[in-house]
Amino acid sequence: MPVMHFRVQWPDGTEANCYSPSTVVGEFFVAGQRYALGDFVERAREALHIGSERVREKYGFACSAAMDQLAQIEAQAERFASDPQAKVNVVELL
């Protein structure tokens, strides 16, 4: 199953490399696009759940790494939740 990584820039300028167990993340994000914080988290949540389910269909178990990545994204996003103007930039899809 092909994995995909995506690099994001958080509202404070820090960057993070993120993991997806499936290329489905490419259907939810466009490199160079900025997303409102809540929209970014929802897209990541849906993409990572779909990717995890694809792993389940193929191997019989969900992808714990996808759920770990989602937890990291949600924790990082929480830091900026009080800023209604917060945006996340998807730097690149790898």
Sequence positions of predicted segments:
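Motif-centric detector for short Cys/His coordination patterns
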Residues: 1-94
